[in-house]
Amino acid sequence: MEVNLLQYEKKYHNYIVAGVDEAGRGSLVGPVVASAVIIDKADIIPGIKDSKKLSKNKREILYERITSNYVWSTAIIAHTEIDNINILEATKKACAIAVANLSLKPQKILVDGNMKFSDIRFISIINGDNLSLSIAAASIIAKVTRDRLMLELSAEFPQYLWHKNYGYGTREHIEAIKTHGLSSYHRRSFKSC
């Protein structure tokens, strides 16, 4: 059965709604990226869904359409700050910055996951990238943005195969760490590192 991705946007139809999602939370390397998107309910872009369910090519196409047609913002928290404040706090900070940087101020903020925020406008939705079009759009922006950053870092450190694993703890990545040690972009706070 196809899930209605506009159910939360319809529930809060009297409000300006932003969807927020992150990419890179479980990675061993690099930043965490959060994006916030306010969709235009009168101009729904077809094909938007959770970024993990889309091919790389489809994500790139939708990224261009979303960033050309909707209000959006992205925030990046570096690996060094993740090590200083922990990944959960870094993710929450990235989400809050992405929302604060939107050119239109949302009244309701739908966030993927179960994070708790002091700002009462934030509404956490477990599996939100599969339940809200706004969150799904944000998941695409966050993933494409972070993947592009990881491709740049991979050119500097090709031995870790970040162009394939994007910094996640694949067998090849763990073996590269054992062989070459940690790069300057690895998160020291992660047990795998």
Swiss-Prot record:
List the Gene Ontology MF annotations in alphabetical order.
manganese ion binding; RNA binding; RNA-DNA hybrid ribonuclease activity
Binding-site residues, a divalent metal cation = 21-22, 112
Q: Which cofactor does it need?
A: Mn(2+); Mg(2+)
- List, alphabetically, the CDD domains matched: RNase_HII_bacteria_HII_like (cd07182)
A GO BP entry: mismatch repair
Q: What is its EC number?
A: 3.1.26.4
Q: How is the cofactor bound?
A: Manganese or magnesium. Binds 1 divalent metal ion per monomer in the absence of substrate. May bind a second metal ion after substrate binding.
In terms of Gene3D superfamilies, this protein maps to: Ribonuclease H-like superfamily/Ribonuclease H
Q: Which reaction does it catalyse?
A: Endonucleolytic cleavage to 5'-phosphomonoester
* Listed SUPFAM superfamilies: Ribonuclease H-like
Q: Which InterPro entries match?
A: RNase_HII, RNase_HII/HIII, RNase_HII/HIII_dom, RNaseH-like_sf, RNaseH_sf
A GO term from the CC aspect: cytoplasm
Every RNase H type-2 domain range: 15-193
Entry-linked Pfam families = RNase_HII
Q: Which family does it belong to?
A: Belongs to the RNase HII family.
Chain's role = Endonuclease that specifically degrades the RNA of RNA-DNA hybrids.
Q: What is this protein called?
A: Ribonuclease HII
Q: Which organism is it from?
A: Rickettsia prowazekii (strain Madrid E)
Q: What is the lineage of its organism?
A: Bacteria, Pseudomonadati, Pseudomonadota, Alphaproteobacteria, Rickettsiales
Q: Which gene encodes it?
A: rnhB
